[in-house]
Amino acid sequence: MRAWHFSENAYPFLPPAEQYDSIRVTLPNRLYDPKKGAELYDRFLREWQIAEEEGVNIMLNEHHQTATCVDPAAPLVLAALARMTHKARLLILGNPVANRRQPVRVAEEMALIDVLSKGRLEAGFVRGVPTEILPANSNPVRMNERHWEALDLIVQAWTSNDGPTSFEGRFFHHRNINIWPRPYQSPHPPVWVSTTSAGGAAQVGAHGYIQATFLTGFKGTPAIYDSYRKGWRQAGKSADVPVNRLAYAAMVYVADNDAKARAGAEKLLWYVTANKVSPWFRNPPGYSPVAANVQMMLGDAAGGGFGNFGGNLTVDAAVANGTMFYGTPDKVFEQIKTFYHHVGGFGNLLLMGQAGHLDHDETVLGIRTFAREVYPRLKEEFPDNAISGRGATSAAATR
C-alpha cells in the first residue's frame, strides 16, 4: 500500500457561519488576509516536505472561490514541490479539465512538471464538483463527456512524438499538437481519475486508469470498486484487478494516546462541518443525471451521506461510516484493515491529514506517527501485488 499526505490548504480564519450564506463561490475575499495566507502556504509546503522525509508521498488538489481549498492553480504549487522535494511521488488530483478551455495547455503543464521532478508526477483528472461551475463560467451540461474527451486529447498530446498531430472531437479541435517538452516518463505519467459514482468508476476501469474515491465510506465504496473491476474486465484488461489501481481518501489522524488523537480528529473534522454551501450551488441543472438526482434526494431524506456535507457529523460517526480513521496507531491500523477488507482492497491511501485549525505541530505529529507506527504495518499487510476483490464478499457480509 502507498500512502499520500493531502491537504486542501484551507483558510480557516472566518467569521461565524451564521454571518455568510456559503463558504464556497460567494464568500467575499475581503475576509482573506494575504499575509496570513502566505504564512499558511509556508507551513503547508513544509508539511509536504516532512511527509516526504517520513517516506509518505504527496498529493494536492484544486478548487476555486472557496476558503476550504485556497489552491486555485494546483500545477503552480506542484511545480514548486517538484523542486523542493527529491523522492516522493507527486500526485495532483486533480486537473478539472472539463472546465478548462485548452486541454493541450494542461498536457504541457503536466509534461513540464514531470520533467522538473525527473519523472515523479502522477497526473490526476477530475470532473469537478458542482460548486466549480460558476467560478469556471462553465456549462454543467455534458460535463462528463467533455472530461473524457479532454483526457483523450491530453494523452494523445503526450504520446505523439513524431511531429504535429491533430485532434477532432465533439468539444475540442486542434490541428497542430506538438508539445515541448514531452513527459519524462514513457509513454506518459500514470493517470488517475476520481469519481464517487459507480457509473463513473466503470469508465475509469475500462481505460485502466487509477481510480480514486473520496469519503464514500463503508456504504458507497464497495459498489464503486465493484464497478471499476467490472469495467476493467469488460475492457479485456485482465481477469485480475491489482489493488494498486484503486485509491481511497479519508480524514486520518494518529497520535500516541487517545486524547491527543481525538483532539486532532475533532479539528480535522472542520473539513466537513464547516462546509456550508448554498443549495443552489450544490447541484446546478444538467450537472447530474436524473437517476443520480433521485438517489441524492433519497439519500438526504434517509439521512444517508453527509447531506450538506458535514452538518453535525461527529468523529465517532465519521469512523463508523468509514470517512475517518483516528486514534492510536493500533486502532488506526485496525480501522483501515477493516475498511480494506470490506471494500475488497485498495492500494493507495490518500490521507487528509490537515484541515481547518489543526496547527503545524499537530499536523506534523499526525504525519510522523502515521508514517512511523502505522504505514510500515500497512505495507507489510497489504502488498502492492495483491488482487482487488478477493475476500470482499465475506468481509462485507460481517458488517
Where are the predicted features?
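Acidic (Asp/Glu)-rich catalytic clusters
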Residues: 49-53, 78-87, 110, 114-121, ...
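Hydrophobic faces of well-ordered beta-strands that scaffold small-molecule active sites
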Residues: 3-7, 58-60, 90-93, 121-125, ...
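N-terminal beta1-alpha1-beta2 module of alpha/beta enzyme domains
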Residues: 1-88, 189, 388-392
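Glycine-rich, proline-tolerant flexible connector loops at the mouths of alpha/beta enzymes
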Residues: 59-77, 97, 215-216, 351-362
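A conserved active-site cap/scaffold subdomain adjacent to cofactor or substrate pockets
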Residues: 197-220, 224
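Active-site mouth loops of central-metabolism enzymes
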Residues: 28-42, 94-104, 185-195, 252-255, ...
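An alpha-helical appendage that flanks or caps ligand/catalytic pockets
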Residues: 5-32, 141-180, 220-343, 379-399
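Conserved, mostly hydrophobic/aromatic
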Residues: 3, 62, 81, 113, ...
